């Protein structure tokens, strides 16, 4: 078990970059990953790409980063959900390392 992980799932790559920037500027966190997904109903969505960004750091820093990222993403295109895992278990850590942008799988 290590540092906290915060995940923000949102609409669009531009919003993801804006949210990641805001989160990293708001707190002492590391931006771990961008996961992207084009859902089957993409044509019906306002923005046809869903992106999840992951922050890692202390619980208080991750909370501040996620809050800032959510505010910024809502200004751009919208947030689907966000969640903070204070101390991920070892098995959860394995799943957190899986990335939709990992082409080695």
Regions found by a protein language model. Give the residues of each.
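Long, contiguous binding/interaction regions
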Residues: 1-50, 56-105
């Amino acid at each position: 078990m290590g540092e906290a992980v915060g995940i923000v799932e949102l609409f669009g790559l531009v919003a993801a970059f804006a949210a990641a920037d805001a989160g990293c500027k708001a707190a002492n966190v590391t931006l771990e990953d961008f996961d992207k997904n084009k859902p089957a109903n993409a044509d019906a969505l306002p923005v046809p790409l869903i992106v999840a960004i992951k922050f890692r750091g202390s619980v208080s820093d991750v909370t501040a980063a996620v809050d800032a990222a959510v505010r910024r993403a809502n200004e751009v295109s919208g947030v689907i959900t966000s969640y903070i895992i204070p101390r991920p278990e070892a098995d959860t850590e394995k799943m957190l390392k899986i990335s939709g942008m990992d082409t080695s799988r």
